[in-house]
């Protein structure tokens, strides 16, 4: 069985400064994300053993652990691609038009997304996703690493609101972190995800 691996980043840890510090990015990538990758592989190994032993209680436990750690791995893999030292500004083209259609304007979208991030209780993510059934953009608060985002949503843009993503630099002032995040958003990546979602995901759930 192939194992999950920690992806390399497209930029150096310090490349997002002053908006997100190199120290945070290094710890975030080599410690936190790496822990989720290990957790996925450990859960898969334990799940295989539990199935061989027909231990249903252990199967359910490790399926739950797999969902959490795989969620963490997927979320962070998107996170690193969503960021760029050349980011910021606003989206263009079809993505910009879709944002205007769904939210009224980019400024209204940004306000709604920021409110989702700043208002999240506990740990989680704010997510801009594409609803493959309704063919529309929606925002969500993702709880922990895998809860509260419905099936059929393809994530396009995420901001990590776990404290490890910002506390060393911004302490408890989450709003300053979210404001800084907009300076490093890789809209080219978000546009690429949007194009793939709209062209490849139609009919996958409801044919």
Curated annotation (Swiss-Prot):
Annotated residues for binding of Mn(2+): 28, 76, 160, 164
InterPro entries tied to this protein: Fe/Mn_Superoxide_Dismutase, Mn/Fe_SOD, Mn/Fe_SOD_BS, Mn/Fe_SOD_C, Mn/Fe_SOD_N, Mn/Fe_SOD_N_sf, SOD_C_sf
Cofactor note: Binds 1 Mn(2+) ion per subunit.
Known cofactor(s): Mn(2+)
Domain of life, source organism: Bacteria
Disulfide bonds: none
Claim: Metal-binding is one of the keywords in the record: yes
Pfam families: Sod_Fe_C, Sod_Fe_N
The reaction(s) this protein catalyses: 2 superoxide + 2 H(+) = H2O2 + O2
Task of the protein: Destroys superoxide anion radicals which are normally produced within the cells and which are toxic to biological systems.
Stated name of the protein: Superoxide dismutase [Mn]
Gene: sodA
